[in-house]
Amino acid sequence: ADIVFPIHPRTAKIFANFGISADNLHIVEPLGYLDFNYLVKYAKAVITDSGGITEETTVMGVPCLTLRDNTERPETCDIGTNELIGTNPDNIKPALDKLFAGEWKKGTIPPLWDGKSADRIVDILVNL
């Protein structure tokens, strides 16, 4: 499987210094929000240490492996496509094996993530 890794230039230098490369590893410069979300939409999965992207993966139905022990967005784990796999690198392969075997959970979009927040806010303000 191809791996696309949007990476900060400083981190890219570290990769180069250590000689980290692989034929299926495509290191690209950081992407803008829309380009990044396009990449996420067509990804088999996302591996991240960020809390924010877990919202996008949940909405898009893309499996997300989060390299953390906790999250500020527990709903992405509870009903979304996100799973906390911890900070031990040895946890990545078993999680990917589960994913590629078709055993990853099928998440749903949280009820209030329906794109109607502004309508609800206006209704509340109008009725004050």
Where are these regions (language model features)?
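Nucleotide-activated sugar donor-binding and catalytic core shared by glycosyltransferases
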Residues: F5-L128
